[in-house]
Amino acid sequence: MEPISITPAATLSPEDLDALRRAKQVLESPSLTMKLTGMLGAPVEKMIARLPDFATGKINDATQLALRKCLNIALRTLGKPQTPDAEPDKPSNLLHKLAVATTGAAGGAFGFLALPVELPVTTTLIFRSVCDIARSEGEDLGSVDTQLQCLAVLGMGGNPDKDEEDADLGYFVLRGALAQAISKASTDITTKGIAAHSSAAVFKLVQTVASRFSVQVTEQMAAKSIPAIGAVLGATVNTLFIDHFQQMAHGHFTVRRLERKYGSVAVKAAYQAIDGSPTR
């Protein structure tokens, strides 16, 4: 008897369908805002309201600097030959968490005074972790597209226009919103190499990611602005921060791995057919 394929999801193997289900659960999971609220036992929005007036400007400046540093790392990585692995090693998520927890301890102890130093270091560690996860899912880190996709992960989960109807964007809607900026930046970098660092297309991509990433950085800083938060809770907040992006990266690059195997149309149809609610 011939196999029956009733739904798009049936075209994926059981193992790959399970992987896609796990990816959807993390990609459509509660926002960082809700995670921080759950950890701290108080709405993050109230903490944001208590931030000093100069906070937004400092956070935006630090975010831009942090993403520029990540872009420099990406441009230096491009074109380096990757060692082909039959089975890529698992990512070093725990090591990256421990490193980010250390920077969070400093941030918790010194607050906004540490921001210009802490955020670029923390963001670089998160970016390296995202790249490590991408590699574990079969991505080529010497590829322009892969590096820009890693940068784009930092823009997942934060929306600068929270009052708009589409503030809580689904994964494929958000991915589509970033796709054009990634494509134009990729073309510039492929054509101009490292000189594309200052091109309009690359600047636009950094701005697009920064507008979303800064929302989550603001939430992170608000959580660490509690009086006498100290180094311990500062480290805990940073650990939650990197865990959020590690989960986004695992989900995003799992979807991309399956798209390389089955095609984007089949994977998107299967994704939409899956119940993304957590199974407990």
Provide a role label for each language-model segment:
Residues 1-103, 128-280:
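Terminal, membrane-proximal amphipathic helices
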Residues 95-117, 121-124, 128:
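Glycine-rich active-site/cofactor-binding loop and its immediate structural neighborhood
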